[in-house]
Structures are given as C-alpha cells and as structure tokens.
C-alpha cells in the first residue's frame, strides 16, 4: 500500500511537470486528473502510447472495455466506434497523408478516436490558443482531420466543434 501511494504521488508530480495537470483524491479514495481539456488529452496521448508499449494487456483487458462500455452507455451509435469502421477511417487517413501506420499505431489511433468521440458527444472539446491554432491549421494533417470531422458530422447530424479538427491534426502529425 505504501509503494502504491508513492507511485501515485510520483505519477502526480510527473503529470504536473509535463502536462500541467493535477491529480486530486476524491472523498471515496478515487483519483481525478484536473486541468484543461487539451492538457488532459495530451496526457492521455502520452500515457496510452506508453501503455501500449509497456503493458498492452492492460489496454486490451481494462482500458478498451471500459471505453467501449461508456460509449454504449452514452447511447452513441455503434457505427461511430466500431473497430472495422475506425480502422477504415485510419487507413483512409494513412493513404491521404501517405504515412504507413503500424498495427499498434492503428489500434492506438482507433482507441484515441473513440475517446475523442466520447468527449465530443459530452460537449467536451480542447481549446487552442492562436499560435497553436495557426500551427495545426498549417499541417497537411489538418485537411485530413477536417475530413474526419465532416464524416462524423454527416452521420451524427451534430456540428463538430471548431477545435476538434485541430486536435485530430495534432493526433495524426
């Protein structure tokens, strides 16, 4: 228990230093990461990629089922987060960007897009400052990200927040 507490404290210091986020303890003993949506997403990006390298079984047995369960619980149409559809979308991005994604990258991107979809559905979107916005808009990946946004918007009949394609450009860069 002491070792776990030390690990949690060290993780809290690390995410504060690298991601400007704080780890807070709830009344029930649970933990919550607090900070901007952009910083939270970048933190998840970092740790999820790390998780794929260090303990892929945890991602497969814990993270993925919890994410899919939440997508289902929120009533999001299955065709949005279906693995086959998302893999096709990632493969389309790969062709448009002329980038080859390894199978682990495809798995990561599909999971991450599911997470973004969950946040989008909840009305949670990252905010970019003008400098970050200009950088993201200048990337080739931004055009592809806009295409993903149009794809989601056509099927969901719900507008995509303007900063969501900026984040997807960052995700694919």
Pin down the residues of each PLM region:
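A cross-family "folded-core" feature that marks the main globular domain of proteins
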Residues: 1-173
